[in-house]
């Protein structure tokens, strides 16, 4: 199997990050997702802050999250990843945003960023002593290896999806048993 390497900025439609501002919290509004809301297998929307519709629209002018985008925690806990496989209605703060319209490309990036090879590579790029972070420029420059044959890509994605679905199911089952 042959691979080619592209920078994330070449592979994705664009690479951005969420707002750096701190929108005022409101009692009921739109969710504002930060790194602490990205979990191993999903988003914790329940503990996300609510922001006003005005702030939501302002944040989304710069960093609108759409279906097939990949979110990446880039401050504090680095490397938690979420692939958006639905139409979202939240805004993001200090989160890497890999914008990808193509579903298969989105899935490949999601799984590729989870590999030990990429995690080690990203760890070598971290800055900051008190609170570590990875820069937006470093995210744009990430080398993404992709099979040259799209059929190889599809086969790999299929296998990884089956494994992840099984892991997710087992994790939920274990959590339910612990809660009982």
Regions found by a protein language model. Give the residues of each.
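A short glycine-rich beta-alpha junction/loop motif
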Residues: 74, 89-96, 128-157
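A short beta-sheet element
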Residues: 34-35, 51-116
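Sequence-specific dsDNA recognition surfaces
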Residues: 5-24, 36-67
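A generic structural signal for short beta-strands and their flanking turns/coil linkers
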Residues: 29, 47, 92-94
């Amino acid at each position: 199997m042959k691979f080619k390497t592209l920078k994330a900025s070449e592979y994705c439609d664009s690479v951005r990050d969420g707002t750096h501002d701190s929108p005022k919290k409101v009692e009921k509004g739109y969710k504002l997702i930060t790194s602490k809301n990205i979990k191993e297998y999903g988003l914790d929307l329940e503990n996300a802050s609510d922001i006003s519709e005005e702030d939501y629209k302002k944040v989304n002018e710069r960093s609108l999250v759409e279906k097939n985008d990949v979110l990446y925690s880039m401050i504090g806990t680095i490397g938690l990843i979420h692939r958006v496989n639905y139409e979202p209605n939240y805004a993001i703060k200090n989160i890497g945003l890999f914008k990808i319209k193509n579903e298969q490309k989105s899935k490949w990036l999601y799984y590729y960023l989870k590999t030990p090879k990429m995690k080690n590579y990203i760890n070598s790029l971290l800055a900051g002593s008190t609170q570590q972070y990875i820069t937006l420029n470093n995210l744009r420059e990430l080398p993404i290896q992709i099979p040259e044959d799209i059929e190889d890509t599809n086969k790999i994605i299929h296998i990884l999806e089956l494994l992840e679905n099984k892991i997710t199911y087992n994790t939920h089952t274990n959590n339910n048993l612990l809660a009982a």
